[in-house]
């Protein structure tokens, strides 16, 4: 079982985000570890299970030293933080990450999305816009979708 589903929620005044119980159960049962590594990703936040994060680091380390590797290190790896759950199933999102993802305004609505091997945390408005763009793209790819069985 991997991460799937979409959950609408909010960040509290202290910057804590509740992660759905279904996702916490997957962390325990599939990964045996509830720690998450949270980093910036394409205007939102990506929360990786500890093991998935380390697999990704190994792939990055294997890259030759070049502009791509440097960009990955600066934009994705450097801002990453380890997060653990409190007793209410929340993680503390650092202010810099909340600002990056547009989660620092008076409206603190978020969407927590399962994305197979990671959990994405989006500003609700941004998530809806991205999903509409994805749906339009998929309509243009109808034959490819049929080939995949969708």
From Swiss-Prot:
Cell compartments where the protein resides: Cytoplasm, Nucleoid
GO cellular component, one term: cytoplasm
A single GO BP: negative regulation of DNA-templated transcription initiation
Keyword Heme among record annotations: no
Keywords linked to the UniProt accession: Cytoplasm, DNA-binding, Repeat, Transcription, Transcription regulation
Domain SpoVT-AbrB: 6-52, 80-126
Highest taxon of the lineage: Bacteria
Coiled coil (residue ranges): none
Pfam family, one: MraZ
InterPro entries documented for this protein: MraZ, MraZ_C, MraZ_dom, MraZ_N, MraZ_sf, SpoVT-AbrB_dom, SpoVT-AbrB_sf
A GO molecular-function annotation: DNA-binding transcription factor activity
Assembly and binders: Forms oligomers.
Family: Belongs to the MraZ family.
Identification of the protein by name: Transcriptional regulator MraZ
Organism listed in the record: Syntrophotalea carbinolica (strain DSM 2380 / NBRC 103641 / GraBd1)
Lineage, top ranks: Bacteria, Pseudomonadati, Thermodesulfobacteriota, Desulfuromonadia, Desulfuromonadales
